[in-house]
């Protein structure tokens, strides 16, 4: 008997996540890879720390242990991709791939063409405490309404959209992520979850730049 490839000893404690084999037969831990689209409500915290109130893991309460690829801050809402496929998470988080993430944003005062231009071309944002001093990468910004706009980012700086707006004298009052790469939030209700499957899942793996573990994911 082995646990995660190591010979087991009498009285050894194991968790549900560990792989247990008797000879060559796996009796626990051969989990099917799962990839989920989650509509995170505002107020839920993206953290794996179970001590934190209203954390996303406890909120989701999914039977398989999953984590997120690309967090949303507590006040933001919308699409999270959550999975137990570590290789997919790592690939999605690699900055060099410039993966697209799209948001709908509401601000506290009327949007101007100058605001749209500056947001599109790049904004200088700073935060001494976070050791942040950067000019944001050019991005696609479109005005939707008097106080709302859409923005497509290919980078993930800390609270980037909020900081960009603040630098231009605006305050974000609502921020919803509606798309990550090819996966769209669509009509998924707040707090709801759906599995990403079939061609949508295949395309996600392709865009993430990995095919590792897809045999398990597509069974």
Q: Where in the sequence are the language-model features?
A:
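Basic, flexible Lys/Arg- and Gly-enriched helix-loop patches that mediate nucleic-acid binding at interfaces
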Residues: 1-219
